[in-house]
Amino acid sequence: MSPLIYYAHSAQDKLGNLLPYKHWQTLQSHLVNVGEMAAEFAQVFGAQEIACQTGQLHDLGKYSEAFDRRLHGGSSVDHATAGAKIAVERWGNVIGKLMAFCIAGHHAGLANGCGEGDNRSTLKQRLALQFDEDIPALYNLWQQEIKL
């Protein structure tokens, strides 16, 4: 069963103890805010809409049980590949892959498209990962909270 509220970031006190949920940032607010900021930055070159959607997809993998466990001290989770996969599914192999490079690399930096990299997976390898096998399955609520 999925939680009613998804969170992007937890909050801790000075001793590292988790603070109550009211101090945490909701995932919906985080994705909307990042989308808005990305659109502002992209205005200078006229790509506001695609930048907004890229920003909204960058942490889509946080809509998962595995990431909820991460927020409570569990192991790290690939939360970027899900958004990269959705971008390619929705916008295809040109715009979608440009978005996917940004989304998949938002922590580790841009990956190679398909050639060997510096101990990082390529975008091609990441896009081949399967939901609920290689990366966490997404809760469907993301489609109601994030309007693409």
Can you describe what each PLM-predicted range is?
Residues 1-148:
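Accessory nucleic-acid engagement/destabilization modules that flank
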